[in-house]
Amino acid sequence: MSEINDTPARLVSAAERLFSEGGEEATSLRAITRAARSNAAAVHYHFGGRDELLRAVLDRQLGPLNGQRVQLIDLARQRHGEPVPVVALLEAVLRPDLELLAKLRRNKVHVARFLGRAHTLPGAAVAEYVRSQNDDLARRLVPLLRQSLPDIDVADLRRRMLLVFATVVMLFATAPDPDQPGLLGTDDVDEQLVRLVAFCAAGMCAPAASDPARVPRKRKKH
């Protein structure tokens, strides 16, 4: 690989390490370029700026997940037919996250925690990246969930899926060291998936909440 073509990879690697070890707010662009043996002009040339570099760091780890989810969703459709059981859909959606988390915990636990924190960072670039990832998955997943949960409206299904992903974000943000089991109580990915899916399926399949606007208010006694 040429020096020119290697520059973006070195910048992303340096940013990933420094963001995860020292915090994204405390890490200057100058520190990143120094660690990457590069300069600010290269950041602007290859990425457009610091926020876009941060987005590239996220995409290195999170970018492949949706493709993996889609493959697993398609396998679930082939195996079960339609409607696909909610548990099978959740297994397809959540397995890639747990496998990535397990991989990062072995030698990059700080990166796992950073990926969790990053979802709460201000800035248009990160917000747009997270939104685009969620929207891409929702286009494939929501129609299948509608078949499986016909009594839940689309807006509620989307809210419930956001809560599922908020749970995943928490797992990344609180990722324990390799010698500790973490929130799911086990290091075995298959067992983690069983426990996480059981929790999330209960929320996804819960009866639709009453619309507060339609609940009659009690009249005050005078």
Question: What do the PLM-derived regions correspond to, one by one?
Answer:
Residues 10, 18-52, 56-60:
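Helix-turn-helix
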Residues 88-92, 103-131, 176-177:
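Amphipathic alpha-helical segments used for helix-helix packing
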Residues 93, 97, 112-119, 164-168, ...:
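Short alpha-helical scaffolding segments that buttress acidic/His motifs in well-ordered protein cores
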